[in-house]
């Protein structure tokens, strides 16, 4: 793998965007990969490595590698705006009719090009349960841990002036570089001290299998030049430097073609024209929203839904689009003292913005190389909270499995306040509820219909109320109070669980972590193929049987690495 990293360095110097789009699209290929996110780009790099396979990757969005706002960590919320599938779910009755936005990455890099760069694997037992659900023992923690080592490496930040627990044995020598932040916003220590005092948690590294505790955060940021480390400028650059790889951007796949039950290729739109690509094998890596959408448009899904829309049924697979889970989070937003560095300061204060720009331009120092503050904690909800309701989903989980994550960021999630804001939130990270993704019509241009069903069971509701109350308990601790000017939201005394619930309903967001809509064990066989079909596989977050207990980008890289091994073994 050290050799691969050296190859990446050579590719970085030799390749800009010359391989980003091909004026003459190929007519056939060994593997077509639909989607240029982390799964698709890892697969492209792995499947092309021997030089024997012709690999074509089709990405609906643009290249992202020269988009400065995405490459600069602190400005990711701004840069992401133009590089997303701007999906909005249906009004959710559990949220009083509010309709969550569910942005997905659009462009090479997918979600890794627009996310907050959190690199976290979470509880080991999640993956052992995935192995049981899927029948693929390669997904068990002991096996998948090797894939985590193979896809990432840790680099020490040269100017970090603070202590942080990092278990360096949990990192390998793969292409993706991860690091800790090079500076602090001023809110990290108060928040950490409050969490330790109020919740009794201690610091861990959630990349070594620990699921519960406090983590000061590892991020997918290059340690030295403080730019985003993501699938496009790691796996993508290496793959795209090879003559047997074709990556075509702005290529929107509209349909998978079949001969009977055998996938034979895809149709896609490029420059206003429909193009047909024949392929020996089709791999769909569009993510948990776009993958089920494409399968449904191609005739793979519930027969009743497809027939209603006039789509010929290739395979009646009722579970396609079902089992949608996410990490919904409910916000408490604070106005903080001027010494805390926030996104508002750097976008509203021209003096602070100029200083930050000068620091970053000079030697990559200063807040522009950070990702807006980054400390989070995870914990379980006591069994007693579920007294009188069916809480088996939560109470039966392995002891290392957390139910709730709390976190903060210097990004104001709630608009309307002209002040320096810190957003804090409580998130259900092992929810019971499931939603679904369906088609609006048989037109590929129409957005899918997304029903989130957040907090959809009595146990979910009890768990998020408990988590939200614990978050506010942390924020009431003296170390945080001295940094707080006012509580912007909810901003009132919440004297009952009903009042807490109303506050949660009023400001719940999607974490952008949808999973499960083409799940292993339900839609897929253990070898990533779709049950009942041939020559088609799915590899992305849609295949998760249920969510990981932390931010999922780290898991997608490892999962794709494991899938590539399985594919190369099976296709010999």
Swiss-Prot record:
Pathway: Secondary metabolite biosynthesis
Entry keyword set: FAD, Flavoprotein, Oxidoreductase, Signal
Induction remarks: The expression of the dibenzodioxocinones biosynthesis cluster is positively regulated by the transcription factor dibT.
Keyword hit for Plastid: no
Cleavable signal peptide: 1-20
EC id: 1.1.-.-
A GO MF term: flavin adenine dinucleotide binding
Active site: 513 (proton acceptor), 551
EC class: oxidoreductase
InterPro entries to which the protein is assigned, alphabetical: FAD/NAD-bd_sf (IPR036188), GMC_OxRdtase (IPR012132), GMC_OxRdtase_N (IPR000172), GMC_OxRtase_C (IPR007867)
Phenotype of null mutants: Significantly decreases the production of dibenzodioxocinones by approximately 67% and significantly decreases the growth rate.
Claim: Signal is one of the keywords in the record: yes
Similarity comment text for this entry: Belongs to the GMC oxidoreductase family.
Cited function: Dehydrogenase; part of the gene cluster that mediates the biosynthesis of dibenzodioxocinones such as pestalotiollide B, a novel class of inhibitors against cholesterol ester transfer protein (CEPT). The biosynthesis initiates from condensation of acetate and malonate units catalyzed by the non-reducing PKS pks8/GME11356. Pks8/GME11356 lacks a thioesterase (TE) domain, which is important to the cyclizing of the third ring of atrochrysone carboxylic acid, and the esterase GME11355 might play the role of TE and catalyzes the cyclization reaction of the C ring.
Protein name: Dehydrogenase GME11362
């Amino acid at each position: 793998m050290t050799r691969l990293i050296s190859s990446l360095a050579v590719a970085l110097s030799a390749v800009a965007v010359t391989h980003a789009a091909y004026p003459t699209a190929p007519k056939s290929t060994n593997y077509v990969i639909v989607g240029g996110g982390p799964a698709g780009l890892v697969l492209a790099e792995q499947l092309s490595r021997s030089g024997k396979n012709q690999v074509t990757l089709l990405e609906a969005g643009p290249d992202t590698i020269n988009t400065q706002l995405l490459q600069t960590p602190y400005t990711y919320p701004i840069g992401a705006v133009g590089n997303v599938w701007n999906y909005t779910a249906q009004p959710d009755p559990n949220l009083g009719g509010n309709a969550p936005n569910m942005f997905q990455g659009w462009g090479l890099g997918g979600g890794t090009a627009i996310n907050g760069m959190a690199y976290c694997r979470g509880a080991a037992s999640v993956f052992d349960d995935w192995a049981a659900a899927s029948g693929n023992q390669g997904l068990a923690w002991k096996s998948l841990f090797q894939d985590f080592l193979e896809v990432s490496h840790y680099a020490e930040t040269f100017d970090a002036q603070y202590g942080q627990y990092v278990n360096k044995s949990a990192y390998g020598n793969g292409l993706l570089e991860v690091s800790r932040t090079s500076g602090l916003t001023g809110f990290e220590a108060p928040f950490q001290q409050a969490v330790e005092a109020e919740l009794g948690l201690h610091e861990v590294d959630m990349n070594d299998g620990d699921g519960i505790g406090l983590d000061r955060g590892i991020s997918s940021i290059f340690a030295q030049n403080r730019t985003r480390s993501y699938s496009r400028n790691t796996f993508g650059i290496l793959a795209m430097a090879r003559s047997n790889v074709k990556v075509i951007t702005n290529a929107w796949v509209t349909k998978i073609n079949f001969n009977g039950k055998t996938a034979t290729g895809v149709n896609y739109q490029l420059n206003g024209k429909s193009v047909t690509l024949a392929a020996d094998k089709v791999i769909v890596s569009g993510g948990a929203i776009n993958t089920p959408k494409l399968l449904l448009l191609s005739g793979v899904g519930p027969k009743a839904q497809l027939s209603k829309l006039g789509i010929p049924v290739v395979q009646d697979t009722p579970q396609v689009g079902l089992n949608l889970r996410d990490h919904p989070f409910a916000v408490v937003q604070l106005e903080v003292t001027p010494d805390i560095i926030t996104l508002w300061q750097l976008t509203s204060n021209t003096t602070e913005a100029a200083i930050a720009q000068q620091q970053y331009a000079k030697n990559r120092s200063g807040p522009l190389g950070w990702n807006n503050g980054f400390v989070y904690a995870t914990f379980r909800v006591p069994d007693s909270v579920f007294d009188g309701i069916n809480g088996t989903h939560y109470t039966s989980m392995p002891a290392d499995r957390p139910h709730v994550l709390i976190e903060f960021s210097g990004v104001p999630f709630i608009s309307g306040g002209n002040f320096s804001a810190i957003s804090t939130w409580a998130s259900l990270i092992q929810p019971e509820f499931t939603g679904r993704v369906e088609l609006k019509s048989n037109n590929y241009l129409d957005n899918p219909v997304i029903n989130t069903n957040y907090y959809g069971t009595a146990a979910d509701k009890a768990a998020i109320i408990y988590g939200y109350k614990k978050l506010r308990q942390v924020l009431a601790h003296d170390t945080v109070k001295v940094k707080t000017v006012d509580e912007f939201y909810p901003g009132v005394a919440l004297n009952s669980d009903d009042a807490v619930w109303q506050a949660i309903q009023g400001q719940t967001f999607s974490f952008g972590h949808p999973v499960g809509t083409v799940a292993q064990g339900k839609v897929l066989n253990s070898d990533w193929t779709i049950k009942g079909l041939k020559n088609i596989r799915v590899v992305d977050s849609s295949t998760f049987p249920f969510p990981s207990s932390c931010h999922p980008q780290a898991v997608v890289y490892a999962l794709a690495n494991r899938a590539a091994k399985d594919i190369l073994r099976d296709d010999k």
